[in-house]
Regions:
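Asp-based phosphoryl-transfer active-site loop
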Residues: 4-21, 212
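Hydrophobic "anchor" residues on beta-strands that sit immediately upstream
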Residues: 7-9, 61, 200
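Mg2+-dependent phosphoryl-transfer enzymes with acidic/Ser/Thr/Gly-rich catalytic loops
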Residues: 3-4, 23-24, 175-177, 181-239
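Non-catalytic pre-domain segments flanking phosphatase-related domains
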Residues: 1-10, 26-29, 33
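Active-site phosphate-binding/coordination module
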Residues: 21-113
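Conserved acidic, metal-coordinating active-site core of Asp-based
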Residues: 105, 110-200, 208-211
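Short, solvent-exposed loop/turn segments at secondary-structure boundaries
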Residues: 20-23, 138-140
Length: 239
């Protein structure tokens, strides 16, 4: 007999919403129903406050930046209190030089805006189409992630001090080691007295290089969300 669940955790973009798009009413309603039975948690790649607002300020704890931000929902103020880990510094010129070499080698020399986005936490976004590319172009660039998976090993080799993920719709996310979603989930569960066998995770990016893959391969009960518009069907057994 399986262990009863106490916590259900979620990825955001591609799982509950389209990329960087507000949550739709039907998926918010599913979250509300799940919240009556389980402790809920967001485990995201992006900024915790951005995730919280993308969810329409839904009452939920939010882990951002692969665990470098811990956001706790405050029911009195209906807001998210965020504590951040100490930023991990990097040599920007060196990072940009490595990114330029990768672009030349892999054929991604045309881009709009910057090549790499440097987040305050120390997480980096290697934006193949550039930091100012149009959202429509990003969504159309690599929907099956095959272009990025083809060069994933080269990106991993170029940035050994980071965990590298096929992130978003057209980029790679680089999180300073040891930060990733598995590490973040394990730390949260330990603090809240929850065993990993009592947790489930819902995500869409569980394939090679995906930022949900580390959770999927950790043996955590995993719900594969292959279409965010069918999220409710995917988790129906939890309701």
């Amino acid at each position: 007999m399986s262990t009863p669940l106490k916590l259900v955790a979620f990825d955001l973009d591609g799982t509950l919403t389209q990329h960087k798009t507000p949550i739709e009413p039907q998926n918010r309603a599913v979250l509300e129903a799940l919240s009556q039975r389980y402790h809920l948690l967001m485990v995201g790649a992006g900024n915790a406050q951005r995730i919280f607002h993308q969810l329409g300020d839904f009452p939920i704890d939010v882990i951002g930046n692969y665990g470098m931000q811990q956001g706790t929902y405050d029911p009195e103020s209906r807001s998210l209190r965020v504590e951040s880990a100490a930023p991990v510094p990097c040599d920007r010129e060196d990072i940009l030089a490595r990114a330029a070499e990768l672009r030349y080698r892999c054929g991604f020399t045309q881009y709009t805006g910057g090549s790499v986005e440097f987040h305050d936490s120390g997480v980096l976004t290697f934006a193949l189409l550039g930091t100012e590319a149009a959202q429509a172009d990003k969504l159309a660039f690599d929907p099956d992630r095959s272009k990025r998976r083809a060069v994933l090993d080269q990106v991993v080799e170029a940035f050994p001090e980071f965990n590298v993920f096929v992130g978003g719709s057209s980029s790679f996310d680089l999180a300073p080691k040891p930060y990733d979603k598995r590490y973040a989930l394990e730390r949260y569960c330990a603090v809240h007295g929850i065993d990993l066998s009592e947790a489930a995770f819902c995500g869409d990016d569980y394939g090679p290089g995906g930022n949900d893959e580390c959770v999927y391969r950790a043996g955590v009960r995993f719900f594969k969300v292959d279409d965010y518009r069918r999220f409710g069907e995917t988790v129906a057994e939890l309701l």
